[in-house]
Every structure is written in C-alpha cells, then in structure tokens.
Regions:
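Predominantly soluble domains enriched in secretory-pathway, periplasmic, or organellar proteins
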Residues: 1-343
C-alpha cells in the first residue's frame, strides 16, 4: 500500500478502525476525564456532560454558532468551531476547561490530514477548504471548491485522497491530499443534500448520508463512482462505526430514528426509534462501545442509546440547537477530525 508519506502505518488492511476497539485508549488520553462536549449552536455555548451521571457539570459561553467539537490529530486538544464568529476555541481535554480563542475564517468543520501535518477547515460559506499548519493553525493553502456547502470529509485508507460532501449542490468532491487539489466531482443520484461521510472498514467504499434522499449512498472512492443507495429513513444525517466495525449507525434526523447497516453485507440490520421522536444529528460512540450519543438538533436535548438493542438510556436537556457533540476520549491512535474519526 502506497501510503501518504508521514502517516501512521495501517494496522489491518481489512479494518481501518482496528485501533478503535473498546476502551483501547491511547497513552496520550488514558488519564483524561470521560466527558461529552455539546456545542449549542443557537445558545452560543458549550455544555459538558458527565456520562456516568448524565448530568451537565459545566456550561461556558462561546461565539456565534458553535457547530462541532473536534479532537486534534495528536489527541491533545479539542476545538470548538464557530463559523459565524470566525473563531476556534480551545478546550483542554485533560481538565475539560476552556482555553484560548483564535481567529479562523469560517470554520464550519475541522479535519486533519492523516500525516498530522495540516488541519483542513471546511469554510462552507467561503466555498473553500483551507489547509493550515496543524501546530500553528496558520494558513498554508486556500483551496477554492467548485460546489456549495462543503462541510464533511473522510480519507482513503492510504491517506492519498479525501472525499468531501457539498450539501447545497448535491455533490461529492475528490481531493488529492498531497497536492491539495480537486481531482474530481460527482453529482449524486438520487439528488439531495449529502451530509456525513465515512470510509468502510476495508477501505474500499465510502458511505455518504443524504438528508434529502433519506438514505446512504455507497461510493467506490478509488474509481469515484456510485455503487448503490440504501434507504435508511427521513433526514439521514450522521454516520458512526460501531466499536467492533460490524455496523454503521445512521442518524435519521427527520424521523427520530437510527438505522444500523451491516458493513459486511450492506443490508439493514435494525432500526431504533427514539420514543416520542426527535431530531438525532451528530455525536459519537462511547469508549466502551456500549452507548451512542447524539445531539437532538431541534429539541434542545442529547440522546443516549444503548447499542445492544437501541433503547433510550437518557434524554438530557441542553442548550438550543445542539449540534456536533464530541464524546471524549475515544479509542484510536490519531484523529482525522469532525466529532471524532479515529484510526
């Protein structure tokens, strides 16, 4: 495998998530407190939840429209991305306390190249992917994109390319990571509003949630073509891989459910309905793999589901517009960004 120079070795060619097994925390994070960080996009605040008690232990104010809480590549920092304030606010995950705030143009979402060299800012309204030095966060290259609403990314198994979703033009972009250039665009069918994107464990396919088409596209990334489409539910939005790499959890924001896709067969294995409905958006899986945490975007709550059968463990009242919550720490050697893509 011809890896992107400088990226960590692939532990298992058949499972890119091999380092993400239950409770296999990196030495870097093993002593960090287990917390859940919730950006309240309409309250301009971050709520911090103790997952043992399901209680909020702290809330602090940030700038306008905090969208996602993002672990850094080296696992040592969390960034709160506030696109309408043009800033990132640091959280120290060793203490759960907020730190400095820095000016960053339009940070709707934040990712990291697999070699840890660059952060990639999804500057959605500016129609750019901004490559910044991962240590200093200084701009290295601003890459204009030929689409609208670029906001979610995942990387190929070898780190050589990324796929990015363009929510408002219904497209995917393929970007050469080393050369930082767009090398392809793909119009999705059925059309709609693509959201989260996630690589299959074997590295051969990408799954792309489509909120308007109510399901998930299966994409051959190497050949950059659509393979199939899996209907999951109204408003398919967030994508999370189970700790055993067997299932993909798909949050269906428009109907208050979570669909499980078997990652070997691509068949639907189950659908979990949130009692009373809801608006499950983004989130993450607990370190032990036993809980799925999701923000209730239009209900000012956070849902906690038991991954053994999908029953609701807790519904926690938070601020308005909770969005890209981060369960932290999680297993993995390094972070590719978003609310936690670990390999």
């Amino acid at each position: 495998m011809n890896l992107l120079p400088g990226m960590p070795p692939v532990l298992d060619r058949n499972d890119v998530y091999a380092a993400d097994r239950p409770n296999e925390l990196s030495p870097v994070v093993k002593d960090f407190p287990s917390l859940v960080y919730v950006p309240n996009s309409k309250s301009n605040s971050v709520s911090i939840i103790d997952p043992r008690t399901f209680k909020i232990i702290r809330t602090f104010a940030v700038g306008k429209e905090p969208q996602h809480v993002v672990p850094s590549w080296d696992l040592k920092k969390l960034w709160v991305a506030q696109d309408l304030q043009d800033q990132l606010t640091l959280i120290d995950p060793a203490t759960g306390k907020r730190g400095e705030t820095i000016h960053i143009d339009d940070p709707y979402n934040v990712y990291y190249t697999p070699d840890g060299k660059y952060s990639i800012i999804c500057a959605e309204r500016e129609r750019r992917l901004d490559f910044r030095d991962a240590k200093t966060m200084k701009v290295v290259h601003r890459l204009p994109v030929p689409c609208d609403g670029v906001n979610h990314i995942d990387f190929s198994i070898d780190g050589r390319y990324l796929l990015a979703t363009c929510e408002f033009s219904g497209e995917l972009l393929k970007v050469d990571v080393a050369n930082q250039k767009v090398i392809g665009t793909l119009k999705l069918k059925p059309a709609g509003m693509p959201q989260d994107v996630k690589l299959s464990p074997d590295g051969k396919l990408f799954y792309v949630a489509n909120m308007e088409a109510n399901g998930v596209h299966v994409i051959d990334g190497d050949n950059f073509k659509s393979i199939s489409f899996i209907p999951t539910g109204k408003g398919a939005h967030g994508l999370y891989v189970s700790r055993d790499s067997q299932y993909l959890y798909v949050s269906n924001r428009g109907e208050g459910s979570v669909t499980l896709i078997n990652l070997k067969t691509r068949a639907i294995a189950a659908k979990w309905k949130i009692p009373g409905g809801g608006s499950p958006d983004m989130g993450g899986v607990s370190a032990d793999g036993k809980q799925l945490w999701l923000s209730g975007r239009y209900d000012s709550v956070v849902y906690v589901l038991d991954t053994s059968d999908g029953h609701l463990l807790a519904k926690i009242r938070v601020g308005k517009g909770p969005h890209g919550l981060c369960v932290y720490p999680q297993p993995g050697r390094y972070s590719l960004g978003h609310t936690g893509i670990f390999r």
